[in-house]
Amino acid sequence: MKTMKIFFAVCILLTAGCSHWLTGEQRQALTEIMEILNTAIAETEEIISRKPDPTSPWRELADKLRTIREHVSRIKEGKEPYDFNLMSKYTNEVLGIQMNVQNPVDRILGVDVFFGPGRYKISELSEEGKEMLRAFASDIVEMQVKKLRALFPDQPLSVVIRTIGYADEMPMSPWFAEALKKDLHQSVPAEPVAKRQMLNRELSFRRAQSIGEYVKMQLESMLTMEKVTVDSPINFGMGEALPFAGEPVEPPYMPQDKRRRICKIHGNVFVAPR
């Protein structure tokens, strides 16, 4: 009997040592955070179902929300300690993501307003394309920055621009290929197809980079409120990969198909980490 009592006492001590007791206020705070999280995740999954493009930021944001929810659940179950500062950080992140999901700002620059063949400098972008980018930057300010500032009047905010460039399968002119190779920090394959693919990947990246920098410049000229910074754009060069079009692309898909010469742009605003 004495041995049994000692056994139960040890079990109680071990259980207590592995549990983190919560106050009523802490439990209420966790419940409220979970409600916001569940709503934000449902809204993010809904926009993914409408815009299932794998290059968009929504899947990453949904994964981030699920990771936060998993951690909050562990805290609520007493498996990890409650941290007020961490909960405050999570709340800011979740509300920021939710605002972006509710007010998406994105564009696709098609071939009609895009760069000419082999071109990538912003000075070579059409005036219609530049006007579209200025309108895109204005939408970020009006639809995202101002709304997040209303939620967090004193917090620093960060604007994140994400650009994804594409190219077709057409070989480049010799003069452009030589000019492009001068700036590369890697050797160019001698085999024609591999060479073309590498140069088109570099071309698509430079187009995305030019567009991202132009949008950043426009945003910085438009933003007048304090504590708002524009991060360095996140640029991707997809080369000859087929852009997601929302529907299956059936062959023949011509090498010079105009649907391949595009750039996708996404804007998001978040509470800046401290």
Please annotate each region the language model reported.
Residues 1-274:
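N-terminal targeting segments with Sec-dependent signals, encompassing both cleavable signal peptides
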